[in-house]
Amino acid sequence: MVVFDLLGEEVDFRPGQYFWVTLLDPPYDDEKGPRRHITVVTSPTERGVLGLATRLRDSAFKRSLAELPEGTEVEVEQPKGSFALPQETDRQYVFIAGGIGITVFRSMLRYIADEGLPYRITLVHSNRDRESTAFYDELRGLEAANPNLEIVYTMTQDPGWEGETRRIDADMLRDHLGDLDTHTYLIAGPPGMVEGVTGTLEEAGIPEDQIRSQGFSGY
């Protein structure tokens, strides 16, 4: 996780939005350049900072991020994006995350906890194994403190995991949620995972206006 100090500036954003970040003097560069859009993992209630979390990959941008010395300045543009925490609190929400797609939901759930908002949410988070699961302990803590939050973890390649191990599809969701029609779904993760989960929900008869999604590609 990388945290940027806003140096006293106030930046207003909705949980789930993203920012364009430009590395001003990166140690590595490639044809994609030093500018990327990144979903913020911190909440608007965490004033004065913007945090991002990503899987480390062998791209110039990520290698540069990993090696930035403390105090390095970067350029952060104004927030964008419509994949944000819905304003309606009277619905039953299902947040579905694949891997590092959890970042967007960490921002939302942290905000809900800090503001004491009455959302009813089931978070379904799919990972390869427990070791690679981001924010596991923190999110379990939020779940323990909020009776309106339930978390379902599925570890698809972890022999030692004693919980759910299936990939996310309509049958798996139905086993944990019951009637799928009564929920509104927010889906974030790798594009293939997002497409697959969206497709299985549509095949189960869930209307388009109850499904919102955002893919996270490598950068």
Regions found by a protein language model. Give the residues of each.
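FNR/FR-type flavoprotein reductase catalytic core
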Residues: 48, 57-219
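Ferredoxin-reductase
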Residues: 1-72, 127-129, 156-157
